């Protein structure tokens, strides 16, 4: 048999790619190797030039952050916002809300009181320090968001007759089978030239612990594996039956199914516990910012042109409903937080390099569908409390509510979170068709769907009038060429938003981008005044 040297680093990288971060960390710990966004909670600008004014375009989180901090510094601030309320993509839909998308389709949300859908952001990772800091400052109550639920489902129409498996079964069996194979490689001496005897023993023990292997290094039906994957019969009390171990999924069938690909989601940095959500809906954050900045905001204002010269900035706008004449506001400086998908359609007097950057970033497509059911059958029938189920069908995910467990009556779950080509296909449908498809696909995981379904609402982000896309989707090439040009101050204008951050699509990116932009703009404004 051919032998070859494998370094510790290569071995760990291979384990990580094959078995995931948890396995790699377990191995790193055994071999003695294993031993985040920045935000200044004391951030404050001061000493604004006397009488200096700033126009902020857009009252999403980036815009309201800029308005809040600039006013604290002493600037005169006015915000122009397209919608009748603030928040932008930080948005929740509740019963009674009406929403009209591009193309004219209007939906009225018919959810019961207390139920809601977050069409945009829905999670706050523990390391998104800026978002959490403003939540604390403004008194936004938070609660846990359940990302990983080991009793949730993993499903493929091409595996196991289309029947879903439990997350815990797939994870336990995948870890067990991989650990068994790696353990055999260790014991057969394949790594002897690269690992000491002590390393080999420690690595084998770590694989036994990680994969729930028996003393001989095998993964099989027994009490140890069932403590990971669940029992065929759970333990009881008194004269009830003893616990019975369950049968692991066949290794070849599991590998062929591809279900293991979904295990990585909860291990990615952005989705690791703890994760939070505002009590009552994500727009509680927007409403908190709005309480601090609302008097500066002119609602229902559609920006149509942005001009600048050496003296200041002039923004032309009209009422969003089309009524009235065009209006203009002037200021010394401008912080523009409009999505690039919108800004690229507006005449803007900036350098060619910034214009090129504005037009270089396409916006990803996404669709979210909220479904209200007559009862919480996922809890009552299947004991799924929060978390996410995954499927290879176009709906991709079903996310169960992380709050009000056991509450009687109707409840809403996220019935689809669609990306890529499927999102374009769903966006082309009518809202009613999107909801119908979500119910059809969801029924492949939960047979209760058709009988328990009550009503739904669907948001396709490329049809959202004020965004026309989900988020700025930088490529490596476009980022290298255009990112710095997009973020630099251009005369008297600076851009901010998730698209001007290294954390696109996240609220944290929007806020961090805004703080960086206004800090630089303030420094520039002060220097300009001194030089005058």
Each predicted region: which residue ranges?
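Short glycine/proline-rich turn/loop motifs
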Residues: 45-48, 108-116, 260-274, 291, ...
């Amino acid at each position: 048999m051919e032998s070859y040297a494998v370094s510790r680093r290569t071995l760990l990288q291979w384990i990580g790619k094959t078995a995931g971060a948890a396995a790699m960390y377990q191995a790193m710990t055994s071999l003695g190797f294993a031993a985040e966004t920045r935000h200044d909670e004391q951030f404050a600008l001061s000493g604004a030039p006397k009488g200096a004014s700033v126009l902020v375009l857009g009252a999403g989180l980036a815009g309201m952050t800029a308005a809040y901090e600039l006013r604290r510094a002493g600037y005169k601030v006015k915000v122009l916002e397209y919608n009748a309320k603030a928040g932008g993509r930080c948005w929740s839909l509740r019963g009674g809300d009406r929403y009209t998308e591009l193309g004219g389709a209007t939906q009225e949300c018919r959810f019961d009181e207390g139920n809601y859908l977050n069409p945009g952001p829905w999670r706050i990772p523990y390391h998104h320090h800026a978002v959490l800091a403003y939540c604390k400052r403004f008194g936004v109550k938070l609660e846990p968001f359940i990302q990983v639920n080991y009793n949730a489902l993993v499903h493929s129409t091409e595996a196991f007759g289309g029947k879903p498996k439990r997350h815990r079964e797939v994870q336990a069996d995948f870890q067990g089978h991989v650990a068994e194979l790696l353990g055999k490689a260790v014991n057969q001496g394949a790594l002897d030239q690269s690992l000491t005897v002590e390393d080999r023993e420690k690595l084998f023990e770590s694989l036994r612990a990680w994969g729930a292997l028996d003393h001989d290094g095998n993964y099989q039906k027994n009490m140890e594996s069932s403590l990971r994957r669940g029992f065929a019969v759970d333990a009881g009390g008194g004269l009830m039956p003893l616990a019975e171990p369950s049968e692991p999924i066949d290794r070849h069938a599991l590998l062929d199914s591809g279900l293991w690909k979904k295990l990585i989601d909860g291990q990615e940095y952005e989705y690791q516990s703890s994760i939070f959500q505002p009590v009552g809906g994500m727009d509680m954050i927007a409403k908190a910012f709005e309480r601090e900045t609302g008097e500066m905001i002119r609602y229902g204002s559609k920006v149509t042109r942005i001009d600048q010269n050496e003296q200041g900035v002039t923004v032309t706008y009209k009422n969003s409903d089309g009524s009235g004449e065009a209006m203009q506001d002037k200021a010394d400086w401008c912080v523009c937080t409009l999505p690039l998908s919108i800004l690229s359609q507006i005449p803007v007097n900036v350098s060619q390099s910034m214009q090129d950057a504005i037009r270089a970033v396409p916006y990803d497509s996404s669709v979210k569908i909220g479904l209200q059911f007559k009862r919480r059958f996922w809890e009552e029938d299947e004991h799924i409390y929060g978390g996410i189920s995954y499927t290879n069908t176009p709906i991709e995910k079903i996310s169960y509510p992380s709050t009000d467990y056991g509450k009687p009556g109707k409840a809403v779950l996220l019935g689809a979170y669609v990306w890529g080509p499927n999102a374009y296909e769903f966006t082309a449908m009518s809202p009613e068709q999107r909801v119908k498809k979500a119910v059809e696909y969801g029924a492949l995981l939960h047979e209760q769907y058709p009988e328990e379904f009550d009503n739904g609402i669907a948001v396709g982000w490329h049809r959202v009038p004020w965004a026309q896309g989900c988020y700025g989707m930088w490529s490596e090439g476009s980022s290298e060429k255009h990112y710095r040009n997009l973020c630099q101050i251009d005369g008297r204008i600076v851009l901010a938003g998730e698209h001007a951050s290294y954390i696109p699509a996240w609220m944290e990116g929007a806020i961090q981008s805004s703080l960086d932009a206004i800090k630089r703009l303030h420094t520039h404004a002060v220097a300009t005044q001194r030089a005058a």
